[in-house]
Each structure stands twice: as C-alpha cells, then as structure tokens.
Amino acid sequence: MKKKKILVRSVLVLVALAALCACAWCVWYIVQYYQGQAFGDRMRTNISDDGGSFQLGRVKIPVDFDELQTMNPDIYAWIKIPDTDISYAVLQRGAEDDQEYYSKHSENGAYYSGGSIFSQSYNRKDFSDPMTVLYGHNLRNGRMFAQLNGFSDAEVFESHRYIYVYLPDRMLVYEIFAAYPHSNEHLLLCHDFSDAEDFAAYFDDVLARKSLQSNVREDAWPQPSDHILTLSTCYRGDNHQRYLVQGKLVAEAYAK
C-alpha cells in the first residue's frame, strides 16, 4: 500500500510538472508573439503612404533594419502598399532550410499560424530576378495579404497603383499592372521568366484569361526586360487557387 501511495504521488508530481511546463511555454509563446506584433506595429507607424517622395531620387529609409535584423536576421526588406494595411517585414530562410517556415512563424520567429510575409531562396534578396514572389496568408482578421483579394474590385485596383519595397540601402517602386486568380502552381519552378519567350507567353496568357475577378492595366504591361514583383495569397479560402497582384519595377531611389 505504501509503495502504491508513493507511485501515485510520483505520477501526480510528474503531471503537475508537465502542466507547469506547458503553462510556462504558453506564456512564453504569447509574450513572444505580442512582442513581435508590437514591434511590427511600431515600425509601421513610421512609414508614410507617400513613399518619401521617391521621384527625387534620394529617400530616407523609414525602416530601422538594424533593429529589425537584431530581432531576426532573416528580415531583409519591408513591403508597403499605400492606403492599405499591407505594411510588413519580408523574411527569407536559407537554401537548406524549410522554405515554408514563415508561413507558420511571426516576424520575430515565434510560432504563429498566421505566418509572415516571406520569399523563398529561389529568389535573390536584392529583387534583381526577373520575377520575385512574396507570399502571405489571407487571414480573416485582415492581416498579412488578406487585402489582396480586394484588388478583384475595379475601383480598388484603379485607386492603388504602386507597391513600395524598402531595402537597407534603397527603395523600389513597382507599378501594379495585374490582379487575378491563378492556380497554385509554383511560378518560379513552372516558368523560366529569364527566358523572353516564356515570359511573354505567361503574360499573354494572363491577358487571354481575363475574368470578372481580374483587373489589368494594358498600358503598363510588362516586357521581358522588366523586373516583376508578384504578391501571392490564398484565393477566398480555395487551397487550389492563389490570388496574385503583380507590379513592374518603375523607380529606384537610394538612401540619403
């Protein structure tokens, strides 16, 4: 009987310790998550919608990349679409790492089902590729890339013409030329955008497949020499489709 009591007590102690550890982990996770959110929100308040008058050729970079990269060295850029809530750090893992890591982790690296805005190692971090793709979830709370689906509305599309990307040493300005639903194929693995014919064929197909959910600016249509930025998110909860918003590089301003 005495041995049985000792065994029961031991089990209860182990259960209590496990519960305590679980609670401690939950508290740590919540603190890490909200610290990351607060940090990102603070950064967002410093970034204006006017792009820092990029036409002048020199801009003050409104993002403190030193502080961001101290928090997480995977942060390498910041994306903003004026007059929307899209204003986030951009992250990328190394070539040997899980390329979907930031689909389930926040900007500070804490686990978060809403993820972050991220690219994959198929792209260079200087946005010099013919096609750069950034991914983000379509969250019900409107965060990340949820507002991209709104570009299916013609008025929204016409009133939002530019995407800003900030790097530590410069700012890139992209003119939005298309927004449309697309299959969930991996663009960078299924197409060679460095090949002029493949590039032209892809975008010819985009024009040919215009639908009620698509909007395009044919006067701003890209050429094979252009650098394209694609923003990709889930299309209205359909895991088999993505909604893409695409822009071409039209201006580049270096830091003051």
Where are these regions (language model features)?
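N-terminal Lys/Arg-rich, disordered targeting/topogenic segments
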Residues: 1-7
